[in-house]
Amino acid sequence: MWPAVRNAIRYLALALTCAAPMAQSAGTSAIALRSRYRIVLAADSRVVYSPNHGATECKLFEIGDVFATVSGLAHYGSSFRATDAIRDGFGTSGSFRDHVAGTAYSLERRIDKLLTTLRQTNPAAYRSLLQRSAQPSDFVELAVAQSVNWQPMLGIVELRRVSGQPLFTARTTICPGKCGRNSEIFYLGYWERIQPYVADSGEPRTVASAASIDRLIRMEMNAHPAEVGSPINILELNGSGARWLQNGGNCSLPGVGW
């Protein structure tokens, strides 16, 4: 049973999922739950490439034995994919902390390379990305989960623009480690409907079940139907491996069973 989440750590990032230059911003709603024995990743499936072009995509990813969800600039045409930064970070030897730090470093370098290229080849797209990154939110946020020696580990990487500059800096959180001893819940993307439901209910709430997590994301779906949409996919990682708690039919990850 999850402890009351009123004491949970909360992170917010206005999500921008892009797949083509000059694509418009799009929202997402994702949740990462962590306890001593398991990690749960959940996300909606709506992406918006332009005002008149949306699609349904799985927002849960498998990179080797690492599972992730991405909020923010998940990909930009063929020039940038946030999952490549995860592949870089976890592709070398080291501890889980080292891998998360490597992911953050790679993410910074890849974003810098993208912006440098756009500044030289497509100034309009460059200005559009910088304008978008000026919002008071994380430009890219990743939640990565891996089972290390039968212990599920969670890493959060937040990439935010340095105020007034075309530079980005990354911050990392490791669980267990920087996180407290209790369970935590991390929100990625829209959460203004979820937050009062969870934190201001007047009594402790638990969100351990797939049905509870689904309900939270549907609150944001109702509030932002153009940017947050079904199906909602939920996976659980514990010391034995990963399994689906809910699969809407659009996620196919070889390492996740039932």
Predicted regions mapped to residue ranges:
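Bacterial N-terminal signal peptides that target proteins for export
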Residues: 1-12
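Bacterial N-terminal signal peptides
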Residues: 10-20
